[in-house]
């Protein structure tokens, strides 16, 4: 009986020890998993800055080549997509700081990308139109932007995947 009790205790003891080891492994695995999740989460969130940097570099490249600001590029793209509209309507699509507004639109007029029109019945309203004479320049600009995006596509996709995984 004594031997049986010792054997039973030995089996129970082994079971208890196994449970303790298993619990230790589970706790350490959870901490490791949490650390990995935290590291992956932090990495993914940091990729927002990396992606933003890639986007900013595209706009910088366009600005350098075409002498147009980000807002001016976005105004043109919006006109090409939506058609002519008032300045007030454009404000819903492209945010231009009030102190830059006049200069931004006037620069596009000077570069001949757009022209302004004031309706006869309302002198306060200004409608902007894309200058259709610059159709070829439009194609060249779109190709330039597409190439700038394509050259960073893999890096941006990797950043985006890491962000989405968060």
Curated annotation (Swiss-Prot):
Signal peptide: none annotated. The gene is rot. Belongs to the rot family. GO terms for molecular function: DNA binding; DNA-binding transcription factor activity. This is HTH-type transcriptional regulator rot. Global regulator with both positive and negative effects that mediates modulation of several genes involved in virulence. Negatively regulates the transcription of several known virulence factors such as lipase (geh), hemolysins (hla and hlb) and proteases (splA through splF, sspB and sspC). Positively regulates the expression of sarS and other genes including those encoding cell surface adhesins (clfB, sdrC and spa). Also, modulates the expression of genes not previously implicated in pathogenesis. Pfam families: Staph_reg_Sar_Rot. Residues 87-110 bind DNA. The keyword DNA-binding applies. Virulence accessory gene regulator (Agr) and Rot have opposing effects on the expression of selected target genes and agr also controls negatively rot activity by an unknown mechanism. The keyword DNA-binding applies. SUPFAM superfamilies: Winged helix' DNA-binding domain. Keywords: Activator, DNA-binding, Repressor, Transcription, Transcription regulation, Virulence. One of its GO terms (biological process) is response to stress.
